[in-house]
């Protein structure tokens, strides 16, 4: 039964690769059709300028949001590492005290 399922999966996988190769990619444009046909920006004029301004505004806002999120992520990482450093320094101090105690016990 497992072999049958494996055979079916392999046939489906092979077929899907074949279908992708024969279909091409969605960005391929058919002959006779301009790229971006029907787009408002390509038409020019006031609507095209407004569309371009809106698009640029959107991407600037998106970039600002991404930078703010990245900054917050880095700040969280820094605070995490500072806490980890403090924890490890306490561990080091604890081990030093243990060694000191062992030396004192050994001297007695």
From Swiss-Prot:
Annotated stretches, region: Antiparallel alpha-helical coiled coil region: 74-106
InterPro entries, per the entry: ATPase_inhibitor_mt (IPR007648)
Keywords: Coiled coil, Mitochondrion, Transit peptide
Residues recorded with modification N6-succinyllysine: 103
Coiled-coil spans in chain: 69-108
Protein's UniProt keywords contain Coiled coil: yes
Subunit-level organization: Homodimer; represents the active form and is present at a pH value below 6.5. Homotetramer; represents the inactive form and is present at a pH value above 7.0.
Stated role: Endogenous F(1)F(o)-ATPase inhibitor limiting ATP depletion when the mitochondrial membrane potential falls below a threshold and the F(1)F(o)-ATP synthase starts hydrolyzing ATP to pump protons out of the mitochondrial matrix. Required to avoid the consumption of cellular ATP when the F(1)F(o)-ATP synthase enzyme acts as an ATP hydrolase. Indirectly acts as a regulator of heme synthesis in erythroid tissues: regulates heme synthesis by modulating the mitochondrial pH and redox potential, allowing FECH to efficiently catalyze the incorporation of iron into protoporphyrin IX to produce heme.
Stated name of the protein: ATPase inhibitor, mitochondrial
């Amino acid at each position: 039964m497992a072999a049958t399922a494996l055979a079916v999966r392999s046939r489906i996988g092979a077929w899907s690769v074949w279908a992708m190769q024969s279909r091409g990619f969605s960005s391929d444009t058919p002959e006779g059709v301009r790229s971006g046909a029907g787009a408002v920006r390509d038409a020019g004029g006031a609507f095209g300028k407004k569309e371009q301004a809106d698009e640029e505004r959107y991407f600037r806002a998106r970039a600002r949001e991404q930078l703010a999120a990245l900054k917050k992520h880095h700040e969280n990482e820094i605070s995490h590492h500072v806490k980890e450093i403090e924890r490890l320094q306490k561990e080091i101090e604890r081990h030093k005290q243990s060694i000191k105690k062992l030396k004192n016990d050994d001297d007695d």
